[in-house]
UniProtKB/Swiss-Prot annotation:
PANTHER family from the UniProt entry: DNA-3-METHYLADENINE GLYCOSYLASE
Record key words, sorted: DNA damage, DNA repair, Hydrolase
Keyword DNA damage: yes
GO molecular function: alkylbase DNA N-glycosylase activity; DNA binding
Organism: Bacillus cytotoxicus (strain DSM 22905 / CIP 110041 / 391-98 / NVH 391-98)
UniProt-recorded name of the protein: Putative 3-methyladenine DNA glycosylase
Family membership noted in the UniProt record: Belongs to the DNA glycosylase MPG family.
Keyword Kinase (UniProt): no
GO biological process, one term: base-excision repair
The enzyme's E.C. designation: 3.2.2.-
Entries under CDD domains matching the protein: AAG
Length: 204
């Protein structure tokens, strides 16, 4: 079952925590690639100095953040790595959740080929398959083509995981400062990164 529109509404920190354990799904050439979300970061513009929308900054890139919740915000870092975010909060409030890491679930063969061009991986390579925002986008083939997509469609969406299979039964959810935002002054210290402690696929 897809996460319905109300799932993405409400406080962004709550949505971030709710996303943990759900599946991020991308259908590529008819094949379902998916992973359990094990690490996220919340970004709460316009007051959050780490957010692209800090100060209400509206550009062609950030305009999606001001739109309806439950849409995909994809952008490039270092000109080569894609990052996938889920838009949250009501229209006009530019907030979102960065998906930082996944535990591979379906379409693992295709993910291996997308990341490494081969099927036989070392333990370290497998652990690195989706343990970072750029890595998971490469594995799931999420690019700027998916930017702005509604997560109610049949191509890219969040799939709710039954309680009996949910990773929260195996791992404790913990929080801490976000990663690689040294420029964000006091926002550097906000404990808005949430992850499953000791899950082998978290980014660090």
């Amino acid at each position: 079952m897809k996460a319905p529109p109300p799932f993405y509404e409400g406080d962004t920190l709550d949505v971030a925590k709710k996303l943990l354990g759900q599946k991020l799904v991308h259908i590529v050439d008819g094949v379902k690639r998916s992973g359990y979300i094990v690490e996220v970061e919340a970004y709460k513009g316009p007051d959050d100095k780490a957010a692209h929308s800090y100060g209400g900054r509206r550009t062609e890139r950030t305009e999606i953040m001001f739109g309806a919740p439950g849409h995909a915000y994809v952008y490039l870092i270092y000109g080569m790595y894609h990052c996938f975010n889920v838009i949250t909060a009501p229209v006009g409030i530019p907030q979102g959740v960065l998906i930082r890491a996944l535990e591979p679930a379906e379409g693992v063969k295709e993910m291996k080929l997308a990341r490494y061009g081969k099927m036989e991986l070392t333990k370290t390579q497998y652990k690195n398959l989706t343990n970072g925002p750029g890595k998971l986008c490469r594995a799931l083939n999420i690019t700027l083509e998916e930017r702005g997509l509604s997560l109610q469609g049949d191509k890219l969406y969040i799939e709710l995981v039954p309680e009996s299979q949910h990773l929260s039964s195996q791992y404790e959810i913990v929080k801490g400062p976000r990663i690689n935002i040294d420029y964000a002054e006091e926002a550097v210290h906000y404990p808005w990164r949430f992850y499953f402690q000791n899950n082998p696929f978290i980014s660090k």
